[in-house]
Amino acid sequence: MKNTVIALLALLASAGSLAATPWQKITQPIGGSAQSIGAFSNGCIVGAEALPLSAPGYQVMRTDQRRYFGHPDLVQFIQRLSNQVHNKGMGTVLIGDMGMPAGGRFNGGHASHQTGLDVDIFLQLPQTRWTSSQLLKPQALDLVASDGKHVVPSLWSPQISQLIKLAAEDSEVTRIFVNPAIKQQLCLDAGSDRQWLRKVRPWFQHRAHMHVRLRCPAGSLECEDQAPPPPGDGCGAELQSWFEPPKPGSTPPVKKTPPPLPPSCQALLDEHVL
């Protein structure tokens, strides 16, 4: 996992330097009623909407990458969440990657974000709106200590817990991925109101942002939902297992070959990519 802001920014920069995928050649949404197709890590979208690039409650980062498209449900979720944050005077929500105009596989940085139902949101809430140069080259705030087991106390705030909780309490949200150390801090902060913690899942990296995932929309018949998270708040043995050293003799997982596209997504590529 990355341990510094510099490393986080290097990861973002490297994603843009890799060879383009066919999906990046589709520069506008595919016309039609909104349909998320396939799985979050192997799919596409018809009828995506562009998130308006600025609103009173949020700003969109790295707009030059054109990753601000998603299912209308995702656009509406971002607007709901940012309105809540704005009305509470918590600051400005910083929106990172959503998806490309037709969804599909990125050239780097993400395995998912393919069906228009995922969004990355920075875990910082500036009181002063960022300038255009700050938005194009955002400074990620690494909240995780160098030991990987705790958050940095001077960087953590109750507002970050509240931001994640507001997102988790939205009925359209099924999962929120954060670093295990961030999940652990949320468990400590939560008090007796813990039902929302079930949706917050520990995952690699995610030291400066949360990755929010929505459920498959009712009208998207070819969309594949994940199984629900396990029962409970996820603050027990499962979470602690993330902090254990690797078992002797364990080897890193082998990178898998991407599976074939869903037929409907392959048909979109065949029709729209020369």
Curated annotation (Swiss-Prot):
One of its GO terms (biological process) is peptidoglycan metabolic process. Residues 1-19 form the signal peptide. Residues 224-263 are annotated as: Disordered. Pfam families: Peptidase_M74. GO terms for cellular component: outer membrane-bounded periplasmic space. GO terms for molecular function: metal ion binding; metalloendopeptidase activity; serine-type endopeptidase activity. InterPro entries: Hedgehog_sig/DD-Pept_Zn-bd_sf, Peptidase_M74. Zn(2+) 1 binds at H110, H113, D120, H211. Its EC number is 3.4.24.-. Belongs to the peptidase M74 family. Dimer. Murein endopeptidase that cleaves the D-alanyl-meso-2,6-diamino-pimelyl amide bond that connects peptidoglycan strands. Likely plays a role in the removal of murein from the sacculus. This is Penicillin-insensitive murein endopeptidase.
